[in-house]
Amino acid sequence: MKTQQREQALAIYQQHQGKITNRAIADTIGVSAKTIGIWKKQDKWKEALFSASKNEQKQRPINNDELNERQRLFCLYYVKSFNATQSAIKAGYSPDSAHVTGSRLLKNEKVAAEIRRIKKEMVNEMFIEAMDVLQVYIKIAFADITDYVTFGKKEVQAVGKSGPLFDEDDNPIMKEISFVDVKDSGLVDGTIVTEAKLGKEGIAIKLADKMKALEKLSLYFDLFPDQFKQKIENEKLKLAKQKAEKTDDSQEPIEIMIKRKERKS
């Protein structure tokens, strides 16, 4: 049943061309929005959507009265080399007249339209790939420790040398302790975790370098709205302040260390 729901969720996402919230999909098939988020990441829905769209465009038949086979080949070769003469030769036209043929083909309205269509597809593909890279930098830059661990205070029963402690009325004696718990790997975004290890001192989780990610994002300021630009600047100032307050000059990425409790002898 879970597999069917997972496939159904992807189908809904693709039907809406990705323009639907996790909550809306979750309400439709009866699972939590968090589950949808996990499926979306693990099954790479965005890539699947783009691949399906690209295959659909590739499979779109070109009417016989638009372009013949050699003209279509010329278009494909031309967008790779932008050399009309060589493209004409590779497409099967006579080498002796390839220079004239190539020039004539570029002036053909239908050929020119097909070249523009192919170029647009190529640009869209490169743009999506570039935005995917930027999205990774965004995730690194604004990573929150609470995405990976939960921490706070909780009450537990006090324990003495002889075991759990109780009061005169046989009620458990409680005490407040601090805790840090690592979230399950299936519930977190592992793409920005560079290292996770279990050593003698406890669990260590190292996240990718936030400052480097912010510097990369700064190179693409013109792609972002003003509000997001301010968010980037605020995060850089915050990191700079944290660095200044440290006693050392460490440039290491964020590392979360959860130490083991030492047993008393």
Swiss-Prot record:
GO biological process: chromosome organization
Ranges that cross the membrane: none
Pfam family, one: Terminase_2
UniProt keyword annotations, A-Z: Viral genome packaging, Viral release from host cell
Family: To B.subtilis YqaS and B.subtilis phage SPP1 terminase small subunit.
The organism's place on the tree of life at top rank: Bacteria
UniProt entry tagged with the keyword Amino-acid biosynthesis: no
Function, in words: Functions as a terminase.
Gene3D superfamilies assigned: Terminase, small subunit, N-terminal DNA-binding domain, HTH motif
Protein name, UniProt field: PBSX phage terminase small subunit
Subunit (UniProt): Dimer of a small and a large subunit.
UniProt-annotated stretches for the region Disordered: 241-265
InterPro entries xref list: SPP1-like_terminase, Terminase_Gp1_N_sf, Terminase_ssu, XtmA-like_N
Keyword field contains Amino-acid biosynthesis: no
Lineage: Bacteria, Bacillati, Bacillota, Bacilli, Bacillales
Encoding gene, per UniProt annotation: xtmA
